[in-house]
């Protein structure tokens, strides 16, 4: 019992040390970090299109079969306080995952809002790369898929932010983090889509914008069609972040393990 308590205490101290280290460094991202932010629009006519897929990420290292069943939201890139958007061609579709598989892991999430230990609870949805208002050629961007999990423990930032996409401008104050999205491998229809960036994760915060209606033509790996979009509470702001899973052996590089997963 004493040995277990000592081990648990060491893990706790290591976790706190990592948080303090990130904070002292100003929560600066790594060199391969993608700075793109996104926000969501509701799909006013959710598309029910069940598809079995196989996915693999840092939480499910052996991979698991799941089913996506409906396209419920669309992600548009945004400038947050004039943040960079390296690829304005890339958008994402939000597909609900039927299998709400539990994870129950702890992780340190770091972004420009700070660094906090969060509890990752269960699987919720998939982000698939998509284009907007492009010809229906079947081509989709070579970019990450993401598995997104319900997560708690990262508080709301203290400030509001200017947010702008090609449709509108807004000011939003994000609420407490609600989801964490991790890069994943996806297998579907006989094709394998590996992640292209295992560093950039997405921390997801509720926001409350209200917009007019928009009707873009959207194409992802599942379908191509017009979507009827509108923003109303709650929508979500996706903030690029880094993640370190806990408990971890502080003598080894977690990011090395993550990269090794996809070699």
At which residue positions do the language-model features occur?
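Bacterial N-terminal signal peptides that target proteins for export
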Residues: 1-13
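Bacterial N-terminal signal peptides
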Residues: 10-22
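Boundary at the C-terminal end of the N-terminal hydrophobic targeting segment
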Residues: 25-29
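Extracellular/lumenal glycan-associated surfaces
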Residues: 35-50, 89-104, 142-159, 198-214
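Short, tandemly repeated low-complexity microdomains enriched for cysteine and small residues
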Residues: 51-68, 104-120, 158-175, 213-229
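A recurrent domain-boundary module in secreted/ectodomain proteins
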Residues: 78, 125, 129-133, 228-248
